[in-house]
Amino acid sequence: MPKSIIIKKNGGPEVLELQDVNVGSPGPDEIKVTNHAIGLNFIDTYHRSGLYPLTLPSGIGLEAAGKIDEVGPNVTEFNKGDNIAYASIPLGAYSQQRIIPTKIAVKVPDGISHKQAATLMTKGLTTNYLICKTYILKANETVLFLSLIHI
C-alpha cells in the first residue's frame, strides 16, 4: 500500500506522520501518479508550522515529479507511463502515489530527471510570475535567480 506524509497538528518536523493510503482510481480529468521525487519549499514549513493555516489533518507538499499509472475519463493529453511534474493545490505531494487534476500537471521532456523537474516547478512558476506579471523584464536588464542556484 502506498504511503503519504500527513500532519494532524502544527509544529516542527516531528509532526510529520507516515501513513498508508488507499489511492483508488482517478476520476474525470484526473491522473494517478507515482511520485519519484518531491520538491521541498519554504511554504511547506509554513503549512506544517501553522503560519499558513490548514484544515487538519492534511497532506503536505506542493510539487513533485513522477510517472502516470492510470488516467481517468476525459483525459486526452496524458497517457499511462508519461513522465510528468506538478505544482499546486491540492496539497499532498509528500506521497508515494496520489491522484491529481490534469490541469496542474505538465509533461517532462526527455533529458530532464524527476529530481530536476520536481525542484523546478514552484520556483519556475514563481520566477515566471515575477518577470512576466509583477515586473516586465526589459532588454539588457540583469536578473539574479537566487532560488534556482541549487540546481
PLM regions and their residue ranges:
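Extreme N-terminal starter segment of soluble prokaryotic enzymes
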Residues: 1-3
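Exposed loop/turn and edge beta-strand positions of beta-sandwich/beta-sheet ligand-binding modules
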Residues: 17, 29, 62, 102, ...
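Conserved hydrophobic/aromatic beta-strand scaffold that supports enzyme active sites
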Residues: 18-23, 65-67, 97-99, 105
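Glycine-rich beta-strand-centered segment in the early N-terminal region that forms part
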Residues: 22-39, 49-92
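Cytochrome P450 core scaffold surrounding the K-helix E-X-X-R motif
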Residues: 43-45
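Conserved small/polar residues in nucleotide/adenosyl-binding loops
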Residues: 150-151
